[in-house]
Amino acid sequence: MKTEIQEIVTRLDQQSNKGEGGESMKWLFRPLLQMLAGGESVTIEDMATTTGKPVEEVKKVLQSLPSVEIDEQGRVVGLGLTLIPTPHHFTVDGKQLYAWCALDTLIFPALIGRSVNIESPCHSTGEPIRLNVEPDHIVSVEPSTAVVSIVTPDDMSSIRTAFCNEVHFFSSPNAAEDWLDQHPGGKVLSVEDAFELGRLMGTRYEESRPANGSCCHI
């Protein structure tokens, strides 16, 4: 399984580098997640200060991201982690946030350095799936049989459309059978294996710590 997980990581990394945000995500994504984890929208100026990048560069990158969620004041409210409700509830320090997909909920605790409580419905049965996840391990999963669906699309120009919208929790492998029938190239992983996949995917953002240490410090 470790070899299979590494193959998925390699495939997704290759597509991500060519897809939405490209290399810019390595310095933008993690600081933005850390700021969004505070439960409030994020200004371009705050992102520039935190990343040490010029305002115009940050603005240009954001304008190139088809999936980023912006409010009427031009502030970021979502990019993977979001203030806008989705089925994937993501609770940090008592703040109710949301994630775009099941795998996001497993990747983000390490990137924001926080313990997270997650609740998401089985994509097939609607049964609630509840997890407590620390940055470096999964504390609990209910039901223990839960799995995560994974796809490896060729085109990641819009990551939410191509990837996130197909990455779900299922209460068991049996509950995922119909989804697998409809997605011949898809896979399902145990939650533990999906967490390991997410951990490896998250390493591409390790260089992107806040530049000045003044915001969302881990």
UniProtKB/Swiss-Prot annotation:
Q: EC? A: 4.99.1.2
Write out the transmembrane intervals. Answer: none
Kindly indicate whether the keyword Lyase belongs to this entry: yes
Q: Does the keyword Lyase apply?
A: yes
Main EC class of this protein? lyase
Q: Which domain of life is it from?
A: Bacteria
User: Molecular function terms in GO for this entry?
Assistant: alkylmercury lyase activity
* Catalytic reactions of this protein: an alkylmercury + H(+) = an alkane + Hg(2+)
Identify one Pfam family in the record.
Answer: MerB
What InterPro entries does this protein's entry cite?
MerB (IPR004927), MerB_HTH_dom (IPR024259), MerB_lyase_sf (IPR053717), WH_DNA-bd_sf (IPR036390)
Which keywords label this protein?
A: Lyase, Mercuric resistance, Mercury
Could you mention a single GO BP entry for this protein? response to mercury ion
**Protein task:** Cleaves the carbon-mercury bond of organomercurials such as phenylmercuric acetate. One product is Hg(2+), which is subsequently detoxified by the mercuric reductase.
Q: Which family does it belong to?
A: Belongs to the MerB family.
NCBIfam families named among the record's database cross-references: lyase_MerB, PRK13239.1
Name of the protein this chain belongs to? Alkylmercury lyase
